[in-house]
């Protein structure tokens, strides 16, 4: 065997050993990895210093938004729930879309309504002193 072949055999062997060591290390620490993931799962959608933790497994309306006021949320307005952000309320085409339960609001906001109308009661021709506009400003 010439020196070049020996060199490549050594490099391939070292690379294979490194991969095997990494797999074995993951195998030994698997319980610790699961515990770490379980402990940090509440931070899955949060933004921390120099780190953005975004869940890319499921696409939702807040994935590409970093300003907290722009993020969509479901809040209780009178006897129903509404979906709102700084852009306004999710609309049903006529007025503010209202939901009877929090879960139905969450389901619509983060799965069904990727392209829905938005109603902002704080811009003209709407009244900026309306109850809906005041509520929107108070929530944000």
From Swiss-Prot:
It is a single-pass type II membrane protein. Keywords: Disulfide bond, Fusion of virus membrane with host membrane, Late protein, Membrane, Signal-anchor, Transmembrane, Transmembrane helix, Viral envelope protein, Viral penetration into host cytoplasm, Virion, Virus entry into host cell. The chain crosses the membrane at residues 1-21. GO terms for cellular component: membrane; viral envelope; virion membrane. It is found in: Virion membrane. It holds the Pfam family Pox_A28. Belongs to the poxviridae A28 protein family. Envelope protein required for virus entry into host cell and for cell-cell fusion (syncytium formation). This is Envelope protein A28 homolog. The lineage of its organism: Viruses, Varidnaviria, Bamfordvirae, Nucleocytoviricota, Pokkesviricetes.
